[in-house]
């Protein structure tokens, strides 16, 4: 999980865009853009018309998510507001930790797909050059993925291997997309939402 940078460029920093140059890295990579206050007199005001991006997703758009970048701290009894994508990235890291606590079988790749697929679309429709997949939606991410998508799966299928604990896990989001599901391992995974993904579903022990 990398910070996009704070230079308001059309693309993110060099570390954030590494999978563009080394594609094998993408399965474990999330770039985090930040939204900060346009007006210094309205710092911490998260009304949409007061927010601006600190960077652009650019070449990293397929692995970018956006969240708020303002951070509050009290110094000598006074509230201070700091901003930067370095404050945005920990929000995504914390979200990944919460998802992993609920779904311990998830690999880093599945955590990435879950976080990106559940983002709220903002800016231009779809995955765009500024916000990537959109605004971090923690509540939705904690319900499992919302897309089985070839752009996220980096192939035709999403691969899930349950952890062998024979527990019952549940995905509560509706799941759409153009990829399929390959489910392995022991345990039970229930898809409670409406599943309209277009790929095949294959379930087996290996």
Segments and roles (model prediction):
Residues 1-5, 32-33:
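Active-site neighborhood of phospho(di)ester-bond hydrolases with catalytic His/Asp-centered motifs
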Residues 18-97, 101, 105:
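Extracellular S/T/G-rich loop segment that most often corresponds to the catalytic His/Ser-adjacent loop
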Residues 6-12:
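Active-site environment of divalent metal-dependent phosphoester hydrolases
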Residues 78, 85, 90-91, 98-101, ...:
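Extracellular repeat-rich scaffold modules on cell surfaces
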Residues 28-31, 42-43, 101-169, 173:
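C-terminal subdomain of the subtilisin-like protease fold in secreted/lumenal serine endopeptidases
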Residues 5, 84-86, 132, 137:
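Residue-level detector of functionally special positions within alpha-helical transmembrane segments
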Residues 3, 112-116, 200:
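Outer-envelope exported proteins of Gram-negative bacteria
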């Amino acid at each position: 999980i990398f910070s996009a940078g704070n230079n308001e460029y059309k693309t993110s920093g060099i570390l954030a865009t590494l999978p563009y140059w080394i594609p094998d890295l993408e399965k474990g990579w999330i770039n985090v853009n930040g939204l900060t206050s346009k007006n210094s007199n309205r710092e911490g005001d998260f009304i949409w018309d007061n927010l601006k991006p600190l960077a652009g997703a650019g070449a990293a758009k397929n692995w970018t998510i956006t969240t708020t970048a303002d951070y509050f701290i009290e110094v000598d009894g006074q509230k201070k507001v700091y901003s930067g994508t370095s404050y945005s990235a920990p929000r995504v890291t914390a979200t990944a930790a919460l998802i992993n606590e609920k779904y311990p079988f998830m690999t880093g790749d599945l955590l990435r797909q879950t976080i990106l697929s559940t983002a709220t679309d903002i800016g231009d429709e779809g995955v765009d050059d500024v916000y990537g997949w959109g605004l971090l939606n923690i509540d939705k991410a904690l319900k499992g993925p919302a897309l089985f998508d070839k752009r996220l799966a980096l192939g035709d299928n999403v691969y899930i291997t349950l952890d062998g604990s024979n527990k019952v896990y549940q995905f509560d989001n509706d799941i759409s997309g153009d990829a399929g599901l390959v489910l392995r391992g022991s345990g039970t995974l229930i898809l409670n939402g409406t599943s309209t993904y277009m790929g095949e579903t294959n379930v087996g022990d290996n």
